[in-house]
């Protein structure tokens, strides 16, 4: 038997249960992964709490919680050629990642070899947030010389967006609470307080692009400052963003995006702060910490 964190009904984190599932063998094109770490994202509990939206993400009850993972391959099907037993891997799966054994079809996207220069706790945080940041930057056409406004810059996607934007040659100003000023400065960004009057506080900053990771306040301020819609993007789908501003999801990532992220880590251009690591048995504490939105960095569960 293997342990898994699942929900059988939609709702708040208290609907989650640790359950025992039978160990299974991979089919011809599948690999079995012994999961070591699970990276948490706000979408994990947002989808769990929204039965209207959940079907859009392929949720089928009972659903295994979370989507990002890292671990080691312990068995492969006879048709698998790109992976072998003992390979350290990471990625994302919409079938749910918080399980000691994850079966992954190699015909699907989303499974990557883990390089030696990075550990499982870090790679378990890369796929959803890193891919989403890469897509958001591409859709906002961020280039060298831009001054980019990032709304919600200290969050899980924000820490990737801030750093990847600088690799592209942009200057970054991030909205966040005043308590995160030093944290964002360490990532190379200037912090500015969110809330009423944002456009006024930004009027001398010469903003040329904007990415919204928290609320449409960022987009509204950027529009007020004259930023064009084709220089903006958002990860917030509901409510709909202002006309002409595209939404960005990690599912739209290019195959080259993860290679770019790993190269940035290898070249010390991108760091992934881990705010906290919790045993799978302490999943409620981990989720509650993320839900209060005051953690500086990613939150990880481990088996």
Protein language model regions, located:
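Adenosine-nucleotide cofactor-binding segment
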Residues: 120, 147-150, 166-217
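C-terminal hydrophobic helical "lid"/dimerization subdomain
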Residues: 259-303
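N-terminal Rossmann NAD(P)H-binding glycine-rich loop of SDR-like oxidoreductase domains
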Residues: 154, 162
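Residues forming the Rossmann-fold NAD(P)(H) cofactor-binding site
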Residues: 159
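Rossmann-fold dehydrogenase core element
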Residues: 230-272, 276
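Glycine-rich beta-strand-centered segment in the early N-terminal region that forms part
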Residues: 22-39, 52-95
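NAD(P)H dinucleotide-binding glycine-rich loop of Rossmann-like/cofactor-binding domains
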Residues: 91-152
């Amino acid at each position: 038997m293997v342990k898994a964190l699942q929900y059988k009904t939609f709702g708040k984190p208290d609907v989650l249960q640790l359950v025992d599932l039978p160990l299974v063998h991979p089919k011809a094109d599948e690999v079995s992964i012994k999961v070591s770490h699970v990276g948490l994202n706000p979408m994990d509990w947002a989808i769990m709490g929204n039965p209207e939206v959940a079907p859009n993400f392929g949720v089928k009850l009972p659903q295994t919680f979370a989507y990002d993972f890292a671990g080691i391959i312990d068995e492969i099907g006879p048709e698998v050629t790109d992976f072998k037993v003992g390979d350290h891997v990471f990625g994302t799966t919409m079938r749910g990642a918080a399980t000691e054994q994850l079966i992954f079809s190699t015909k699907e996207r989303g499974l990557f070899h883990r390089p030696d220069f990075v550990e499982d706790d870090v790679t378990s945080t890369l796929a959803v947030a890193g891919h989403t940041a890469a897509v958001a930057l591409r859709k906002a056409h961020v280039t060298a010389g831009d001054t980019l406004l990032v709304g919600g810059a200290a969050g899980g996607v924000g820490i990737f967006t801030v750093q990847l934007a600088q690799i592209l040659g942009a200057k970054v100003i991030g909205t966040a609470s005043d308590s995160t000023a030093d944290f964002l400065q360490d990532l190379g960004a200037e912090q500015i307080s969110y809330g009423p009057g944002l456009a006024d506080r930004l009027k001398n900053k010469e903003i040329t692009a904007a990415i919204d990771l928290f609320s449409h306040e960022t987009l509204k301020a950027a529009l007020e400052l004259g930023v064009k819609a084709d220089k903006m993007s958002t990860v917030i789908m509901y409510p709909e963003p202002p006309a002409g501003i595209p939404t960005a999801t990690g599912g739209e990532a290019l195959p080259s995006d993860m290679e770019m992220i790993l190269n940035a880590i290898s070249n010390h251009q991108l760091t992934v702060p881990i705010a906290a690591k919790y045993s799978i048995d302490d999943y409620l504490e981990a989720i509650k910490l993320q839900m209060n939105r005051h953690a500086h960095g990613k939150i990880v569960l481990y088996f």
